[in-house]
């Protein structure tokens, strides 16, 4: 099978997704739009939503202009990253913003039509709402996969004509191999991440400022029901549902979807880049794209399985959505198995990694539903605490949220282990990281239908509000309530799914970051022209950057828990999560305060408004404006913090500090996000459980207590919690994009600060040794292929990239004591060795006894801490090369390269190991 043909699953699937998104949109627009009053209310919501979106995009556009200039400076002036990066950054943000706009336009047009359809039957209401949500789902996957496909074809074409571009002004845009292509493509994920964070934070602040203001004054103080047209904040509340849960959720999952595919492609290019599996490199890159393409086909089939019957219960409705999702998941799993078998022959176990991702997504969704739906015990217990007041409701909800972290965290942990293990990670770390990435792709492959269930929620919620404000008959309201209740559960499930996918994607990005370090070091070496910059120094030997393994980089940058730079990074990452949450929650509080004051003012100053007298009309626009202004102003600081902190940590603490930052942010952010989303969901549904008639029903003291809990939970589940998904991914994306800046300038910054990191000391001492002639570096294009290929692929040495072990007396050498290698001594000694048997004694390979004599020489050079001659163990391996040296007669023939032969024959006999 021609692998390039299988790539076309991606662009064809993308075009098909966009085609069906247009079909579903057209079908929705052709349906009955409802009464004149219903259309009027929907018009208010649509106008407010679009007004907010355009104002947000203006602010985001200004940020993108500044960021573009910054990346252009890094690319064209400092030359620390690819010139393609600024352009890729813009396209990622543009497509993310476009998907949000199209999803919002669909959702705001669908609410009145869902209400009208629900007046006919429950099934028709479900169909209109769900297929309108499917527009968002398929727009996200279609635009995401189309963007990836276009970039892949462009960069492949540039690589194919690189020779003709070398002497032209376009030479700076030349790409040389698949590793460079995939790392360039990965950087457009930062554009998507940045847009997603602004959408999530801004949308979350908007919706919850309106929601909290409407609830505190409307329900708690005035005692009027939810979605009552007398409440001036009710339209802003409905606008917020679309801004936060349609545009925000869509941008969030667009980022995860693209990030997982691109990170996996980059990891595949690395894992299959050299060694015996190098012929599968292209296959490994294209596999995540092909799986995502067939996932679109499967999602389209699943959409047509979502239908229900009249008098359906909540579980029946959940079952109908679950049926569609499960059909899509099964079809995707089968197709992924076939693709893996075809594209990765001999590596079918990678299919197990895909299944690990798929299954973990289902388990996380189920766990979220269990802890947040009112049909289950945890949320009912929260509602039961309302009999003793709001304080115990808040305590119970917090406890429920904390308890709910168990299953998702364990599930993701097990999924990571299985995905890593199935791909062969315990024998080969690069393959294991590829398995984690492909697991994230498996979880997100059915995003078309899973995002449809998420976007369905706010559409159904708006339809219920529309029916309430239009005073439609109780039967219609009953149906819209059923759809709304289903939407609350799917929204909570979707948040859990988004958090789980964010965790797996961030894990894959951690691995991809190391590949960006490699590319950054290569670019730095090409810019400086210094031979020494083409090596990193790992355990007694220089290793060419292009052949270095994951473990080589971790050792070179001293990434271990005893390194204070790593520990400080971990603490900063954990702290950043809580500071970010605090900033977003305080932002909601400030904006909600303004909203409460405005609603109170209108109740006092507009005659007859609170009593519902004819002619008394609330000023909805002023409340929308307050939420909009509050969201625009408050979203900037936390968003910029998430972008600036990784850049500063990279410069001041280096790659080891960045790894700590990302690990701390991921572990803390994932757990806190689950806790906040599920605590907020349980408070919300506890209130709805009481409103259904339990514990006194609406208007009772228990109801008021649960309203307080729901109000506290609003920023938990719709602002801070969901924004953490993007925070942990955006930090990784920023680190990936500025990796070139980090590797080029962090050693200098740290040296000025007096940190003198290990990698800087290694390179400085090696540089001195090269200049004074005591160290001769090997050819970086060929040296190290054996050891590094073995480190990447060989079962005998899967991680280390070196056969050498560190003796106790050499531990100090690893900390920068010395860096010399035997090769330096062997090459000058090669000429006298064959002359006569007598002078051969000083040569290290001649006999064990005289070998100790020249040992002080490298130490005097200042670059000798890695000398093998100084080791007591050195004479033992020296005996093996002595056998060929014992025949002096033929020694004249191979005279020009005795040292090279010795180094290759016995890695342990010299400082270069396999080199």
Give the ranges of each region predicted by the language model.
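Long, low-complexity intrinsically disordered repeat regions
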Residues: 774, 779-915
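Hydrophobic packing and interface segments
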Residues: 1-787
């Amino acid at each position: 099978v021609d692998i390039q043909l299988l790539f076309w699953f991606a662009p064809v699937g993308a075009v098909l997704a966009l085609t069906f998104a247009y079909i579903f949109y057209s079908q929705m627009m052709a349906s009955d739009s409802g009464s004149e009053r219903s259309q009027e209310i929907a018009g208010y919501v649509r106008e407010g939503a679009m007004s907010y979106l355009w104002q947000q995009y203006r602010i985001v556009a200004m940020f993108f202009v500044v960021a573009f200039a910054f990346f252009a400076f890094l690319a064209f002036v400092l030359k620390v990253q690819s010139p393609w990066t600024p352009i890729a950054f813009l396209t990622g943000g543009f497509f993310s913003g476009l998907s949000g706009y199209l999803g919002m336009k669909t959702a705001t047009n669908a609410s009145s039509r869902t209400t009208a359809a629900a007046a006919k039957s429950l099934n028709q209401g479900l169909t209109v709402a769900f297929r309108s949500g499917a527009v968002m789902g398929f727009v996200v996957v279609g635009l995401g996969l189309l963007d990836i496909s276009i970039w892949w074809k462009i960069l492949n074409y540039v690589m194919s004509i690189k020779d003709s571009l070398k002497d032209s002004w376009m030479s700076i845009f030349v790409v040389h191999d698949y590793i460079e292509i995939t790392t360039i493509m990965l950087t457009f994920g930062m554009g998507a991440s940045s847009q997603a964070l602004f959408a999530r934070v801004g949308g979350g602040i908007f919706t919850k400022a309106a929601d909290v203001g409407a609830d505190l004054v409307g329900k708690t103080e005035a005692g009027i029901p939810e979605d009552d047209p007398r409440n001036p904040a009710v339209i802003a509340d409905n606008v917020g549902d679309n801004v936060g849960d349609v545009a925000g959720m869509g941008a969030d999952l667009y980022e995860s979807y693209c990030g997982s595919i691109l990170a996996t492609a980059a990891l595949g290019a690395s894992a299959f880049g050299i060694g015996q599996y190098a012929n599968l490199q292209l296959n490994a890159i294209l596999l995540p794209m092909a799986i995502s393409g067939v996932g679109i086909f499967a999602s389209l089939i699943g959409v047509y399985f979502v239908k229900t019957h009249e008098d359906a219960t909540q579980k029946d409705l959940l079952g109908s959505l679950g049926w569609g999702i499960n059909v899509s998941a099964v079809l995707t799993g089968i197709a992924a198995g076939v693709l893996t078998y075809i594209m990765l022959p001999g590596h079918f176990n990678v299919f197990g990694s895909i299944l690990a991702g798929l299954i973990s997504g289902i388990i996380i969704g189920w766990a979220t539903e269990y802890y947040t739906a009112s049909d289950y015990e945890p949320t009912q217990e929260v509602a039961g605490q309302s009999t003793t007041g709001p304080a115990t409701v808040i305590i119970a909800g917090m406890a429920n949220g904390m308890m709910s972290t168990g299953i998702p965290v364990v599930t993701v942990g097990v999924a990571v282990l299985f995905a890593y293990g199935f791909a062969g990670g315990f024998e080969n770390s690069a393959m294991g990281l590829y398995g984690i990435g492909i697991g994230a792709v498996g979880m997100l492959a059915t995003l078309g239908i899973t995002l449809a269930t998420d976007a369905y929620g706010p559409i159904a919620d708006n339809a219920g509000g529309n029916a309430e404000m239009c005073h439609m008959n109780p039967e219609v309201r009953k149906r819209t309530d059923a759809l709304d209740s289903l939407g609350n559960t799917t929204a909570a499930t979707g948040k859990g799914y988004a958090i789980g996918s964010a965790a797996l994607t961030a894990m894959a990005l951690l691995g991809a970051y190391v590949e960006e370090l490699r590319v950054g070091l290569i670019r730095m070496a090409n810019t400086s022209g210094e031979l020494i910059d083409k090596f990193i120094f790992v355990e007694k030997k220089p290793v060419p950057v292009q052949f270095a393994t994951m473990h080589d980089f971790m050792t070179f940058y001293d990434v271990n828990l005893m390194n204070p730079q790593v520990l400080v990074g971990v603490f900063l990452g954990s702290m950043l999560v809580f500071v970010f949450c605090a900033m977003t929650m305080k932002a909601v509080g400030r904006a909600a305060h303004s909203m409460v004051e405005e609603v109170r003012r209108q109740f006092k100053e507009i005659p007859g408004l609170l009593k519902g007298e004819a002619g008394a009309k609330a000023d909805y626009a002023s409340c929308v404006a307050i939420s909009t202004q509050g969201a625009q102003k408050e979203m900037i600081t936390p968003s910029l913090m998430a972008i600036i902190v990784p850049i500063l940590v990279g410069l001041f603490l280096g790659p080891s500090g960045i790894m700590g930052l990302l690990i701390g942010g991921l572990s803390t952010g994932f757990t806190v996000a689950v806790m906040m989303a599920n605590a907020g969901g349980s408070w919300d549904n506890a209130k709805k459980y009481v409103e259904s008639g339990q514990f006194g029903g609406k208007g009772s003291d228990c109801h008021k207590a649960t309203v307080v809990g729901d109000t506290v939970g609003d920023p938990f589940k719709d602002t801070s919690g969901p924004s953490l998904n993007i925070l942990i991914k955006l930090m990784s994306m920023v680190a990936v994009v500025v990796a070139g800046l980090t590797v080029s300038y962090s050693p200098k910054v740290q040296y000025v600060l007096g940190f003198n990191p290990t990698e800087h000391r290694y390179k400085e001492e090696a540089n001195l040794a090269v200049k004074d002639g005591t160290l001769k570096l090997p050819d970086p294009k060929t040296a190290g292929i054996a050891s590094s290929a073995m480190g990447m692929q060989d079962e005998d040495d899967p991680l280390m990239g070196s056969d050498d072990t560190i003796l106790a007396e050499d531990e100090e050498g690893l900390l920068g004591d010395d860096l010399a290698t035997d090769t330096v001594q062997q090459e000058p000694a090669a000429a006298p060795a064959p002359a006569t048997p007598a002078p051969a004694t000083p040569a290290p390979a001649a006999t064990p006894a005289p070998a100790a004599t020249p040992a002080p020489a490298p130490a005097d050079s200042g670059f000798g801490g890695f000398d093998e001659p100084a080791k007591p163990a050195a004479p033992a391996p020296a005996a093996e090369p002595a056998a060929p040296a014992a025949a002096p007669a033929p020694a004249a023939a191979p005279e020009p390269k005795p040292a090279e032969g010795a180094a290759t024959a016995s890695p342990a006999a010299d400082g270069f190991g396999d080199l």
